[in-house]
Amino acid sequence: MAHKKGQGSSRNGRDSNAQRRGVKVYGGQSIHAGSIIIRQLGTKIHPGNNVGMGKDYTLFSLIDGVVKFERLDKKRKKVSVYATA
């Protein structure tokens, strides 16, 4: 009997890359126009004032300003960007 295992016997050894979702800029932080605020699956957080949404639900800033997380109603949240005076 062989004292070493044959080549190619393992069926493991695969792993997918992380998708790097989540909040990229937090409340109170300043942001430039076009910068990503949140990467998400579905509208966990909705776009508010001066925030756009990409086809993959990514939220991004439309203006330079400060990020603010707010309530839309009891269940839903939104993120807005307000210009600094």
Curated annotation (Swiss-Prot):
Keywords: Ribonucleoprotein, Ribosomal protein
Family of the protein in this entry: Belongs to the bacterial ribosomal protein bL27 family.
An MF annotation (GO) of this entry: structural constituent of ribosome
Domain of life: Bacteria
Stored HAMAP family: Ribosomal_bL27
Species whose genome carries this gene: Syntrophus aciditrophicus (strain SB)
Organism lineage string: Bacteria, Pseudomonadati, Thermodesulfobacteriota, Syntrophia, Syntrophales
Sequence segments annotated as region (Disordered): 1-24
PANTHER family: LARGE RIBOSOMAL SUBUNIT PROTEIN BL27M, RIBOSOMAL PROTEIN L27
Protein name: Large ribosomal subunit protein bL27
Gene3D superfamilies: 2.40.50.100
GO biological process, one term: translation
GO CC annotations on file: ribonucleoprotein complex; ribosome
One Pfam entry name: Ribosomal_L27
